[in-house]
Amino acid sequence: MAATALAVRSRIGAWSVWAMQSRGFSSDTPEGVRSGAGAVRDAGGAFGKKEQADEERYFRARAREQLAALKKHHENEISHHVKEIERLQKEIERHKQSIKKLKNDDDD
């Protein structure tokens, strides 16, 4: 039964690769059709300028949001590492005290 399922999966996988190769990619444009046909920006004029301004505004806002999120992520990482450093320094101090105690016990 497992072999049958494996055979079916392999046939489906092979077929899907074949279908992708024969279909091409969605960005391929058919002959006779301009790229971006029907787009408002390509038409020019006031609507095209407004569309371009809106698009640029959107991407600037998106970039600002991404930078703010990245900054917050880095700040969280820094605070995490500072806490980890403090924890490890306490561990080091604890081990030093243990060694000191062992030396004192050994001297007695």
From Swiss-Prot:
The keyword rRNA-binding does not apply. One of its GO terms (cellular component) is protein-containing complex. SUPFAM superfamilies: F1 ATPase inhibitor, IF1, C-terminal domain. Residues 26-52 are annotated as: N-terminal inhibitory region. The modification N6-succinyllysine is found at residue 103. Residues 1-25 form a transit peptide. Homodimer; represents the active form and is present at a pH value below 6.5. Homotetramer; represents the inactive form and is present at a pH value above 7.0. Endogenous F(1)F(o)-ATPase inhibitor limiting ATP depletion when the mitochondrial membrane potential falls below a threshold and the F(1)F(o)-ATP synthase starts hydrolyzing ATP to pump protons out of the mitochondrial matrix. Required to avoid the consumption of cellular ATP when the F(1)F(o)-ATP synthase enzyme acts as an ATP hydrolase. Indirectly acts as a regulator of heme synthesis in erythroid tissues: regulates heme synthesis by modulating the mitochondrial pH and redox potential, allowing FECH to efficiently catalyze the incorporation of iron into protoporphyrin IX to produce heme. This is ATPase inhibitor, mitochondrial. It comes from Sus scrofa (Pig). The gene is ATP5IF1.
